[in-house]
């Protein structure tokens, strides 16, 4: 269940206790998690957060911290992706098969970006850097593709 909760954008407060954002895009997934827990013999308890500023601020900080960590991991993966492209160029591995593999890796980064963006409720600063880095990765792949096609045209 914890994987599904994380996928929803939930934050683990302590063992077995999670904070889940409410609203469109979250409610259906949360209902599914509750049903799955019940079907497995569990007894989920749902509590609404008190509407006081201190609790709201603390929860927002927890969600922001988690999203920043995800964006940092995403940015690190972007760096690894660009390093992989540079390594293939350095090795002269300019093949269509390699291009296909790198296109799949970029698509994985795009999916991951969309996933994090969907659960980034507060628009943390890391999102802007992530968007920029994803564009840079796309440009790097375009340059790699150009090199692959140029290599194919050489006798």
PLM features per residue range, with description:
Residues 74-118:
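Charged/polar low-complexity intrinsically disordered segments, enriched in acidic residues
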Residues 107-155:
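Glycine-rich, aromatic-bearing surface loops/beta-hairpins
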Residues 1-86, 137:
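Positively charged, polar, low-complexity stretches
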Residues 25, 29, 63-66, 70, ...:
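Non-transmembrane, amphipathic alpha-helical segments
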Residues 41, 48, 82-89, 93, ...:
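Long, hydrophobic, amphipathic alpha-helical segments used as structural scaffolds
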């Amino acid at each position: 269940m914890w994987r599904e909760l994380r996928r929803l954008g939930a934050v683990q407060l302590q063992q077995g206790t999670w904070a889940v954002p409410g609203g469109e895009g979250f409610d259906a997934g949360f209902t599914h998690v509750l049903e799955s827990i019940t079907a497995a013999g569990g007894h989920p308890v749902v509590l609404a957060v008190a509407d006081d500023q201190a609790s709201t601020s603390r929860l927002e900080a927890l969600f922001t911290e988690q999203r920043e960590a995800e964006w940092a991991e995403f940015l690190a993966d972007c760096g690894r992706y660009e390093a992989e492209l540079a390594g293939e160029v350095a090795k002269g591995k300019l093949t269509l098969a390699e291009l296909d593999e790198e296109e799949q890796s970029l698509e994985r980064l795009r999916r991951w970006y969309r996933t994090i963006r969907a659960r980034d409720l507060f628009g943390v600063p890391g999102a802007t850097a992530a968007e920029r880095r994803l564009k840079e990765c796309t440009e790097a792949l375009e340059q790699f593709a150009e090199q692959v096609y140029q290599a194919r045209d050489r006798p």
